[in-house]
Amino acid sequence: VARTYLLLAWTWLRASAQYPVPLVMMVLGSFVLTGMDVAAIWIVFGHTRSLGGFALAEVMFLYGTAGVSFGLADLLFGNVDRLSQHIRAGTFDAMLIRPASAFVQVATDRFSVQRFGRLAQAAVVLAVALPRLDPPWSRIWMVPVMIVCGVVIFASIFTIGGAMQFLLTDAPEVSNAFTYGGSTLTQYPLTVYGGDLVRAVTFIVPLAFVNWQPALYVLDRDDPFGLPYGLRFAAPAAALVLALAAALAWRAGIRRYRSTGS
């Protein structure tokens, strides 16, 4: 499956590389556009010393980890969000009869290099924030773990959103609230939101495990909401459970799918 994914993605990358100037402009445009979010945070800190009790470097750390996780998930699996377009056009039927995973084909269709810009911008922010925080080496190991778990969580939400489109062809708007909306939510300390929302993204849609709970461990901060200390280490379990749910949802969608006949 991984080999097929890389082959199909490379095919689209080669096609995009035929037009290098537009390609570079799209990547730079994405980099600059997402950079406006960072500018907004800087503006906020121009008027206050903390946001939800967190300093600038800590907020940038949250922003960077959320951005890298979402950027990788969006780059690798964001196209699953376009499943309804394939269903309406009838191209999904063709994918089902090809000797390759339908999921991989949907994920790599029109593999977008533009998304590299978002990922690169978040990586730069994270690279700048980490040295300013200077966390102890005994805690730094959590950073790659939280990024990997964040990728799995966002990819699973993309997949569940795609599976919903087998039943509701207008489901992308719903899934976007949890993918792109979830990305925006996790860029900031959860202390700026209400307690009910925090509990929802901890125990229902586990967005708090993208970076919030692991970050509390890295930053050696108490949980402002008084949740158990063990949740700081629960990101792998949350990612695994959501990934299994996504796999089951996708398989159920495939079984229920009926050709549009187009």
Language-model features, listed with the residues they occupy:
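Hydrophobic transmembrane alpha-helices and immediately adjacent juxtamembrane helices
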Residues: 1-262
